[in-house]
């Protein structure tokens, strides 16, 4: 008698009819957890980081390799994007100034710095970069947009392709001596702040729309 994955009998199969007999334990799941699944996103790519002192500067190198998927990251809706954040602080918790390297673009979220904007998910202007497929609506010129059903034009696309590696470097000014703590985070965001804020969607990291994909801390003496 045929049995299912839980060992229970399958009684609706006619002998010799209805297809090829297979061991249920060998049939892979066809579930699609999607972009709300933390475990899926946190096993999508490999991040490697290094930090070293060069005179009065701290040089941070970040490598991201899309080695665990067969498609671009992020994929599906053009609303989705990734934010790479690179922080360097002294022993007093003061942020070191970025002297060379990329910063998160405006659509990473512009907030009120007096209210600790970065802690609320407004990352525009911070050391790091973003990965996204940017579209512009041809009639309204709204960009970035996720309304791909409207007439749109491709502005840029720097998403991480399958098996591709992105390497970026960031140089921070620092005292010639003294400990420096470097923190690197890769955040998956499911919608732009310009859309999420008016709708009241939750954005805080670890919430419904922001998922922490990778994180690493380094200490430079």
Feature-to-residue mapping (PLM):
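Primarily the internal scaffold of c-type cytochrome electron-transfer domains
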Residues: 1-161, 168-174, 185-221
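Exposed beta-strand face motif in extracellular beta-rich ectodomains
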Residues: 178-182
């Amino acid at each position: 008698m045929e049995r299912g994955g839980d060992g229970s009998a399958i009684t609706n199969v006619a002998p010799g009819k209805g297809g090829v007999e297979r061991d249920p334990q060998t049939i892979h799941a066809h579930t699609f957890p999607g972009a709300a699944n933390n475990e899926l996103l946190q096993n999508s790519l490999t991040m490697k980081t290094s930090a070293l002192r060069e005179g009065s500067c701290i040089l941070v190198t970040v490598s991201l390799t899309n080695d665990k998927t067969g498609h671009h990251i992020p994929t599906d809706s053009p609303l989705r994007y990734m934010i790479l954040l690179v922080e360097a602080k002294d022993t007093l918790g003061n942020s070191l100034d970025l002297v060379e390297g990329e910063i998160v673009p405006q659509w990473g979220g512009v907030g009120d710095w007096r209210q600790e904007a970065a802690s609320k998910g407004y990352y525009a202007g911070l050391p790091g970069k973003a990965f996204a497929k940017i579209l512009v609506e041809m009639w309204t010129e709204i960009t970035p947009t996720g309304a791909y059903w409207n007439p749109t034009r491709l502005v840029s696309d720097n998403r991480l392709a399958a098996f591709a590696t992105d390497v970026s470097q960031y140089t921070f000014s620092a005292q010639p001596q003294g400990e420096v703590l470097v923190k690197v985070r890769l955040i998956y965001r499911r919608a732009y702040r310009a859309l999420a804020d008016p709708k009241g969607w939750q954005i805080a990291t670890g919430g419904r729309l922001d998922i922490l994909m990778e994180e690493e801390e380094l200490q430079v003496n």
